[in-house]
């Protein structure tokens, strides 16, 4: 059995993303932004073609390549079932909570489970920049 990897994942994002992200985390889903990229086709492209798939999408949108694209890369490609994720600021900014990735499914806005869809009101959902989700379980809160 491979040793698990450890990741730090800071939750932030557009207006209302913080609140919805924390609701998702309470319900067992870790989230990341990139809603403009959110599709299962994009996930498959990243898994097959690596970071170049992210870079290509950036360039199609006429965006300059930025370092934060590596956060999306780690979320989609490097995080695996059994890995641990340290999330600062949840439930408060003074502490870190630890979660474990429970499977290798990556959800996007075109295949999200009903329990994700039901979180947040319509106004929050429209304004939040959330695009990808991973199922997690709590290991330790408020460390």
Task: List each language-model region with its residue ranges.
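Compositionally biased, charged N-terminal/linker segments
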Residues: 1-72
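Conserved nucleotide-binding/hydrolysis micro-motifs of P-loop NTPases
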Residues: 12-16, 92, 142
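Short, well-ordered loop/turn sites that connect or cap secondary structure elements
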Residues: 73-80
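Short connector loops at helix/strand junctions that flank enzyme active sites
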Residues: 80-81, 94
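Structural motif
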Residues: 83-85
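Aromatic- and Lys/Arg-enriched surface recognition patch
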Residues: 94-143
